[in-house]
Amino acid sequence: MVGTAKAKQLTHFCLTEHMPRLTDQYLYPEELEKGYTVANLKANFENYLTHARRIQARENLAGQIQILVGFEVEGIDLAHIELASMFKKQTDMCIGSVHYVHGIPIDFDREQWDMARTASGGTTRALYKDYFNLQYEVIRALKPDVIGHFDLIRLFQEDEIDQTGRLLSEIDVERDWPDVWELIVRNIKLVVSYGGLFELNSSAIRKGWLTPYPRKDLARAIVKFGGNFCLSDDSHAYKQVALNYHRVWEYVQELGLTHIYHLELNSLGKTIVAEDSVAALSELTFWDQYK
C-alpha cells in the first residue's frame, strides 16, 4: 500500500484499520464464513498497530512520504464509541464512521440495509434520522479528525416511492425532509466547531456512484456551514490507492472549493491540519497519471 502511494506521488498517507467489534453478533457475513471471532479482530488490530508504527518509523525517517497511523471508528453503539476513545489515545488520528444502524450493517448489501430500515420503523426517512443521530453521538463523544463517508446510509438506497408519493431520487432532503436536514446541519456544525474534516471519499465511485461521498446536496451544505474537505480513497487494497482521484478533483472544482486540507505530523509529532490551494494542487504532475 505504501509503496503504491509513493509510486503515485502521494506526499501524505494515513494508514487505518477498522477498530475491533465487541461481540460476534456484529461480524459481517463474509467474516463469519471465514470463521472469524471478535478475538481474531482484536488480534488483527493489535498486529496492525505494531506493523503500521514500524512502517511509519521507516518511511518518515526516509522523508519521501509522511505516514500517519490511525483507525476507523465502528460507531455501532455507545459501548463501541467508548472503546474507540481508548484507541484514539494510541493513534495519530481517527475516522468517525457509522456502518451499523440498530446493530445491522448498512453498507454490506441491500438485504441488511432493508433490515435496518425495518428496525427504524420501515421508512427511509426514519432510517436517515437514526443514522444521523448515531453519527452525532460519534462526533460528540470522539471529535474525530475526519468524518468518514458522511452519507454512507445512501449506498444501498433504491429509487422507491416515498410516503410523499414521489420517487426517492426526487426527494430534496432540505425541502421535503426538514427533520432529517436539521440533523445533518447539526452534525456539520458540530464538526466545524472543533475543526474536523470531511472526506471526499472516492470509494463511492468504484461502488457505482457518479460522485464521491458525500453527494452534492450534503457537500454543498458542508461548504455553506464552513466545513473543510480532505481526500480519501478508502483503499482496502493497493490497486485502490488514489483510485478515481481525477474524478474527485473534478468534483472539487464543481463545488467551487478553493482549498483542500490534509492531516500531517508537526516537528513534535502532533497531528495538525494543513491547507493547500486547489489552484496550486491542480498544477501538480500527479494528475498526469490519469490521462
Predicted regions and their residues:
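Short, well-ordered alpha-helical microsegments
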Residues: I76-A79, R215
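Histidine/acidic residue-rich metal-binding segments in metalloenzymes
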Residues: V2-G3, N44, L49-L61, Q66-L68, ...
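Hydrophobic faces of well-ordered beta-strands that scaffold small-molecule active sites
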Residues: F13-L15, I67-F71, C94-G96, V146-G148, ...
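Divalent metal-binding pocket/active-site signature
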Residues: P20-L22, K89, M93-K189, L197-L200, ...
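An N-terminally biased module of ancient metal coordination in phosphate/nucleic-acid-related enzymes
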Residues: M1-D77, M86, I161-P178, S202, ...
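Charged catalytic cores and adjacent phosphate/nucleic-acid-binding surfaces used
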Residues: M1, R154-F156, E160-K291
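A short acidic, often aromatic-flanked loop/helix-cap motif at beta-alpha or helix-coil junctions
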Residues: I76, G103, S267-K270
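Short, conserved acidic/polar surface loops in the N-terminal third of protein domains
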Residues: Y26, L78-L83, P105-D109
